[in-house]
């Protein structure tokens, strides 16, 4: 007779079965993705609003602090990537002087694994991208939807790639890049680069990676949060999307600073084929380091993803060697930071959160300077030959803090107006101006750069109406008058307007200005116009004056349920 087989107690079997889901599988693999986007030349630490650092204990970001955190994570975790989603170029005196050499130098020191091209990488033309950056970096720069043609094709061949396969901890990870197809309207890429639709261009490159047996694929790019989500939904085979361009702040839990989250981090998109795809951005200006943990199964499917942007505040020390290197590069910039142009006794709000959504006093200052620069007194019938100014909110890049004794330097202005354009004089019909103001708000709320700041103009919008029918009132300051007053815009009348050369060329989608302008005279450099005005005024205090207004319907539409609730509350009170 055979002995009975030994059986485990039922309680032990139950306990083991409960632990099985927690037991690590040999096939799963975890990747840490550190990421930045829209740094915009913030190599030094800045104040909390990304202006010049005034109190070191309250300052954030900078490459020396970023280096410390990146090195710490690399030492603590086995499988790590450091990625950048574009727009390292443009934003402070650093780029004005060094023109991209500083970007290549410090990104190499940080050891980036890959970067996507942003629209601002083309601000100095293709040559301003090739020589300072593409030929000097030690990591791949990516974009799958930019195609070179003509004489540029052989010149730029191999300097940027559609994708790159990286080896990380014994696994292979594919990184595929993309860039906003609107770049020709936003920057200066020239005519020999074609910017294709992102989704259409990405799919065949992802398919190529799949044929190479790469089953973990990150889309890294610079087209904005809406496009990031669309790529996650539509491009088969993309596992993670790391984006930029819209300075989107995502966070799970209580945010550590003043940025308001646009959603949880990571933001999960369900793809058309049923996968859960994490999408991330890390705000802008080097204030945060994006930190995403992704677990893949043996087939390359995302099992879990979690993390949060890390606020790079003063609790993280600045690396001494990188800081010393920054100080050496800084010497060449000192002349720009010591010359005082004038003083402000109010905060000059040039933030994207303000100037791309409503009237901002920095926009008012710039427009007032532009009109002042064009003061001419042709005869006794006219107090001036031009009274109107428009400036795209996306061209205003930084605030100026009045708490540094109110001092305004050339360096401060270079952060506000970093593009080096001119303020030009044009003649336009009233009908063209009406089209321009409809364009200003046709996609209002997306933090896009076409929202217009004004001078000599009063405009009222109703955002509850459909796009291209949102301007409900448009008045302009008369010029042929002894006492200037605001008069309704006349569609067939020809008006003079001062505006950035960028808009003259159709930038930010203002094609109607380029196509319909009747006369154009080039003006003075933008930063010179504003600096001379500040020097003349000595002390400035621009206000928000009601130049741009939104009708009551715009506000009521979003609050309709609250209005109904309030109505019934009043009825109940009356009849109690």
Swiss-Prot record:
Signal sequence interval, chain numbering: 1-28
Cell cycle listed as a keyword: no
Enzyme Commission (EC) number: 3.1.3.35, 3.1.3.5, 3.1.3.89, 3.1.3.91
Tissue spec. comment: Expressed in the brain.
Gene Ontology MF, one: identical protein binding
Catalytic reaction annotation: a ribonucleoside 5'-phosphate + H2O = a ribonucleoside + phosphate; a 2'-deoxyribonucleoside 5'-phosphate + H2O = a 2'-deoxyribonucleoside + phosphate; dTMP + H2O = thymidine + phosphate; CMP + H2O = cytidine + phosphate
InterPro entries: 5'-Nucleotdase_C (IPR008334), 5'-Nucleotdase_C_sf (IPR036907), 5'-Nucleotdase_CS (IPR006146), 5_nucleotidase/apyrase (IPR006179), Calcineurin-like_PHP_ApaH (IPR004843), Metallo-depent_PP-like (IPR029052)
Binding-site residues for Zn(2+) 1, renumbered to this chain: 38, 40, 87
Residue span(s) of the pro-peptide: 552-576
Keyword field: Cell membrane, Disulfide bond, Glycoprotein, GPI-anchor, Hydrolase, Lipoprotein, Membrane, Metal-binding, Nucleotide-binding, Signal, Zinc
Residues that bind Zn(2+) 2: 38, 87, 119, 222, 245
Covalent lipid sites (GPI-anchor amidated serine): 551
Lipid bilayer topology: Lipid-anchor; GPI-anchor
This protein's GO CC annotations: cell surface; external side of plasma membrane; membrane; plasma membrane; synaptic membrane
Subcellular location as annotated: Cell membrane
Known cofactor(s): Zn(2+)
Pfam (any one): Metallophos
First-tier enzyme category under EC: hydrolase
Glycan-carrying positions: 55, 313, 335, 349, 405
Keyword field contains Cell membrane: yes
Protein's job: Catalyzes the hydrolysis of nucleotide monophosphates, releasing inorganic phosphate and the corresponding nucleoside. AMP is the preferred substrate but can also hydrolyze CMP and GMP. Shows a preference for ribonucleotide monophosphates over their equivalent deoxyribose forms. Other substrates include IMP, UMP, dAMP, dCMP, dTMP, NAD and NMN.
Assembly and interaction partners: Homodimer.
Name of the protein in question: 5'-nucleotidase
Organism: Rattus norvegicus
